[in-house]
């Protein structure tokens, strides 16, 4: 008895792509990338070259125009009088445009230089005796000093008003008799105040000095000073608790400002 055994054949494995195909795809990819880079570089070169050719063409046209104008002036060539007049008028219009642009640029530069040169603004006033019992000090119109009178003014003899925004150094010196009879024993207080364009008022600086019982009158001074930003229409003034104690001699009490 003969027994036969059937053996199953192994599954066939699909062969992968050959090595030559991989090399071909790699070279094709490199070629395409190189071609794209080369095309981009060529486009840039062509654009620059066209710009250069355009500039050269414009220069050539200008050269031809100048040669034609020279021939018109010398009466050379076969150009008619009408053509020469047209060329001359074009040239004159071109010169006028250049001169106009030059003058405009010059005026702009001068205006910018004038704008950069900020005018100096300063004022200094001295006190004036007043019979008024108001706490705001009065300042004498004589002895009123200012560098730019149109940008700072003394209003009502009390306030220094500015017309230009900026940083200002504001100062005040108030001299008072410390042992003169007063209604109270409270310290003498001097305040530097701001009156804003909106109408509100606030204290910028304040200083106090105690009274003295010594005789004769003991002169004491209070000094105030600081840098503040002022807006157009703003004004500053000096306020004291007892104006009857203030000394109004030469150089005793003064007030001023300086734009920085």
UniProtKB/Swiss-Prot annotation:
The chain crosses the membrane at residues 23-46. GO terms for biological process: B cell differentiation; B cell proliferation; CD40 signaling pathway; cell surface receptor signaling pathway; inflammatory response; integrin-mediated signaling pathway; isotype switching; negative regulation of apoptotic process. The soluble form derives from the membrane form by proteolytic processing. It comes from Felis catus (Cat). Belongs to the tumor necrosis factor family. Homotrimer. Interacts with CD28. CD40 ligand, soluble form: Exists as either a monomer or a homotrimer. Forms a ternary complex between CD40 and integrins for CD40-CD40LG signaling. Disulfide bonds join 177-217. It comes from the Eukaryota. Its main location: membrane. The record marks 111-112 as: Cleavage. This is CD40 ligand. Glycans are attached at residue 239.
